[in-house]
Amino acid sequence: MNNTEFYDRLGVSKNASADEIKKAYRKLSKKYHPDINKEPGAEDKYKEVQEAYETLSDDQKRAAYDQYGAAGANGGFGGAGGFGGFNGAGGFGGFEDIFSSFFGGGGSSRNPNAPRQGDDLQYRVNLTFEEAIFGTEKEVKYHREAGCRTCNGSGAKPGTSPVTCGRCHGAGVINVDTQTPLGMMRRQVTCDVCHGRGKEIKYPCTTCHGTGHEKQAHSVHVKIPAGVETGQQIRLAGQGEAGFNGGPYGDLYVVVSVEASDKFEREGTTIFYNLNLNFVQAALGDTVDIPTVHGDVELVIPEGTQTGKKFRLRSKGAPSLRGGAVGDQYVTVNVVTPTGLNDRQKVALKEFAAAGDLKVNPKKKGFFDHIKDAFDGE
């Protein structure tokens, strides 16, 4: 067996995170579960998935598997340099794990019957620019795995109950003897009859087919606070998918996506607005109405205003998520040069130019400009 077979069984890469491995396991475990999938070979696939997950979900076993393959994960080899000592860095996790291997004690093995929280879900909600500024409330509708309403989550047909597994006697695990360089070692593996649940379902529920879960439509109202931005998340506890073995529901994470505005741009609590002025307004000054998310504001444009000039409108920006402070809005001027002038306008501009000195001081050449001129032959 190569050192990637377990990863291949779960359909993940060798660099997969613990969460990616868990999600892949749950998906495949549900797909090949003997109570659901009656196709030939499904049970063997289920056992292979269980074996792979048992190793890859344990950091110590996974490290040994990555280095030595299945033999290392099963305790056949120690860490680097032989047996790696008894400090937990080698193939065994110290004296406790050694005695656990011999006598089937608790050690570091997890209890397969322990309650486990359900999977978290993610939902993207779209907001207008203004909704993100002022906050809003949205109804989120989605489907999730919930407790089966027919069997109340037991997985058993109504009127029947799961019974204690006769092979593992409710433990969910069985002891398996393995030959190693140190001799015969005992380890615990998931029960191949009840698949770690400790109970057998003789008569599966016809709705959920023994899983205890069913896909259900669900909706919840979420309050979007004022000042949110794209990518920020709102956590709704207990609104994810149903847990396992009586564990709690997972959480729902509502991810915000804010639509772009055709007027404004935003960075945090600061809002930006571009103001176009004609050259007469810029030269003589004017009073103009500036749109803000809080309503129009009068802005006095002084004489001689140039392109790039910025004006600050205090407290006309977005609120802080932390409450209290409200940002500012900055107005940036762009002086627009007129095009398509008629004859009268051209004459007027020429007279205007002749009436005074319109020369603009040329930009002073810098060091690199002189070098460029030299190469250009000037």
Swiss-Prot record:
Q: Name one GO cellular component term.
A: cytoplasm
Pfam families the UniProt entry points to: DnaJ (PF00226), DnaJ_C (PF01556), DnaJ_CXXCXGXG (PF00684)
Q: Where are the zinc fingers (CR-type)?
A: 135-217
One GO molecular function term?
Answer: ATP binding
Keywords of the record: Chaperone, Cytoplasm, DNA replication, Metal-binding, Repeat, Stress response, Zinc, Zinc-finger
InterPro entries in the record: DnaJ, DnaJ_C, DnaJ_domain, DnaJ_domain_CS, HSP40/DnaJ_pept-bd, HSP_DnaJ_Cys-rich_dom, HSP_DnaJ_Cys-rich_dom_sf, J_dom_sf
Cell compartments where the protein resides: Cytoplasm
User: Which parts of the chain are CXXCXGXG motif repeats?
Assistant: 148-155, 165-172, 191-198, 205-212
The record's remark on the cofactor is: Binds 2 Zn(2+) ions per monomer.
Family assignment from sequence similarity? Belongs to the DnaJ family.
**Entry note about domains:** The J domain is necessary and sufficient to stimulate DnaK ATPase activity. Zinc center 1 plays an important role in the autonomous, DnaK-independent chaperone activity of DnaJ. Zinc center 2 is essential for interaction with DnaK and for DnaJ activity.
Annotated protein name in UniProt: Chaperone protein DnaJ
Query: Which organism was this protein described from?
Result: Streptococcus pneumoniae serotype 4 (strain ATCC BAA-334 / TIGR4)
